[in-house]
Regions:
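Alpha-helical transmembrane segments of integral membrane proteins, especially early/N-terminal helices
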Residues: 1-13, 59-69, 134, 139, ...
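Hydrophobic transmembrane alpha-helices of multi-pass small-molecule transporters
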Residues: 1-41, 199-327, 454-457
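Hydrophobic core segments of alpha-helical transmembrane domains in multi-pass membrane transport
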Residues: 6-19, 49-57, 142, 149-153, ...
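Transmembrane helix-loop junctions in multi-pass membrane proteins
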Residues: 18-28, 59-64, 147-162, 243-257, ...
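Membrane-embedded alpha-helical segments and adjacent helix-loop junctions characteristic
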Residues: 24-120, 307-392
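Hydrophobic alpha-helical transmembrane segments and immediately flanking/interface helices
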Residues: 110-131, 167, 171, 252-264, ...
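Membrane-core helix-loop-helix motifs of multi-pass transport proteins
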Residues: 119-235, 397-457
Length: 457
């Protein structure tokens, strides 16, 4: 399916560009997106990948990943029946889903790539996506969001009266998109057109063949001593105290930290944080997102060290894979983003808007949302620009702006996710993953419009 979509984007871009006199824009779009794929996405991702793969190595060697997978075994076994309950992929997928829920994009992508690498160890047809890979991608493109931070930030920057009004609508919409994605991927995996034929592996070019990934079960770590348990309890209590102090008494927390900051850095001025004025539930979610990364970066090495793991050596061993993964995804990123850039430069998005507007307007779908909805599966940065322009033009408190913010927070750049995740393990036959991801996006869009009409009118 991905072959036909890619060919359609490229061919239509050339035809539309030739018919409308925009071939120069088509060429510029191709070159700009090729440069972006390498210089602004793949290479910066290498450092982030190295960090989180190193941290995941510590979690794996200390036995934390296995414990997390065991705790969620009943749910994960139903979603991924082809993956053994004690397989490392279970823990990697759980970590990725948790990061997505908290809006930790810098952590979610490396953890998701690690999960794909673990799932590849179970793949009997290299180059072809397994059912577990397709299910994981469908969940990833529709993951439940507790706090759509980017959409809220854009609404707040345009002086919305209540920029956090979309938190509830985005949460409900992501539930709908997740359910739709899971149902779609499970229903389509046995369709004849998507079924994997026994022994039929996709042809994989030697230049992109993934390295063999042995299933490494870490040795049993040393038992946690009593004083080690006390140290972990103290560490957790410290973060719990920070969390509740900021959530329950944010003004006192900011005053105390500002006083300490002035004592240590007397020449700097501390600006008051905006979270103090937010409602308590939003402060709780915001503080959870803020503390999550520092907690993980501190807890995993501490736990591993207390269980006898050589933390520096194991971190470096895990981080070694980061650059290799970034290199492997470059051809797939270039292919997808170049096609998107050409189609957008040719005016294909505007043409689709003109064709679909007469059909969707009678159904209560605002035509102003169409460009953003059409671009969303293709490009995150372009969607951000379109959303910002829409908010500026219609007002941040308009119904359409709130619909757009809800859509932004409940959908995903499906083709980018496919290129990065499948590219990391050289999967060329995506099977039903694309269709399931787009169905999840469509469900998120429809749910966003309906929920916003019910809540804001």
């Amino acid at each position: 399916m991905l072959n036909y979509l890619w060919l359609a984007l490229v061919t239509l871009a050339v035809l539309i560009g030739g018919a409308t006199g925009r071939l120069r824009e088509v060429t510029e779009g191709a070159f700009q997106m090729a440069d972006m794929a390498v210089m602004k996405i793949a290479l910066p991702l290498a450092g982030i990948m190295a960090l989180w793969l190193g941290v995941m190595r510590l979690a794996e060697q200390s036995g934390l990943v296995q414990k997390l997978a065991a705790a969620l075994r009943p749910l994960m076994s139903r979603l991924f029946p082809d993956v053994p309950a004690d397989h490392p992929a279970m823990g990697s997928m759980v970590m990725n889903m948790a990061a997505n829920m908290l809006g930790l994009a810098n952590a979610a992508t490396p953890l998701g790539l690690r999960a794909m690498r673990d799932l590849e160890t179970l793949n009997r047809t290299p180059g072809t996506a397994t059912n577990a890979m397709c299910t994981f991608l469908a969940i990833n493109t529709s993951s439940i969001q507790l706090l759509p931070t980017t959409a809220i930030a854009i609404l707040a920057s345009q002086h919305a009266q209540d920029p956090t009004a979309i938190v509830g609508t985005a949460f409900l919409a992501t539930i709908c998109s997740t359910v739709a994605g899971v149902v779609a991927v499970k229903a389509m995996q046995n369709w004849p057109m998507f079924r994997v034929q026994p022994g039929a592996a996709a042809a994989v070019s030697p230049s992109v063949t993934p390295d063999p990934i042995p299933l490494r079960l870490p040795p049993a770590p040393a038992p946690l001593p009593a004083w080690g348990r006390a140290a972990l309890i103290l560490f957790i209590a410290l973060f719990a105290g920070l969390f509740f102090w900021q959530v329950i008494a944010p003004t006192a927390y900011q005053a105390s930290t500002a006083h300490l900051h002035r004592a240590i850095f007397p020449s700097t001025v501390v600006a008051p944080a905006a979270e103090a004025a937010a409602p308590l539930p939003l402060r709780a979610i915001g503080m959870l997102s803020l503390l999550a990364v520092p907690f993980l970066l501190g807890f995993f090495p501490l736990y591993a060290a207390l269980r006898g793991v050589k933390v520096y050596e194991e971190f470096v061993e895990g981080a070694k894979e980061g650059f290799g993964v970034a290199l492997r995804i470059i051809p797939f990123l270039v292919a997808i983003l170049v096609a998107v850039g050409m189609f957008r430069g040719a005016g294909g998005i505007e043409a689709l808007k003109s064709a679909l507007a007469p059909l969707l307007t009678p159904l209560g779908f605002p035509p102003d949302l169409l460009p953003m909805v059409l671009v969303r599966p293709l490009s995150g940065s372009a969607t951000t620009g379109l959303f910002t322009e829409l908010v500026q033009r219609l007002g941040p408190d308009s119904l359409t702006a709130r619909m757009a913010g809800t859509i932004f927070g409940s959908t995903e750049t499906t083709f980018y996710v496919i290129a990065v995740y499948f590219g990391s393990v050289a999967v060329q036959r995506a099977r039903h993953a694309v269709a399931a991801g787009l169905i999840a996006d469509l469900a998120g869009v429809v749910a966003s419009v309906i929920i916003c009409r019910l809540m804001f009118t």
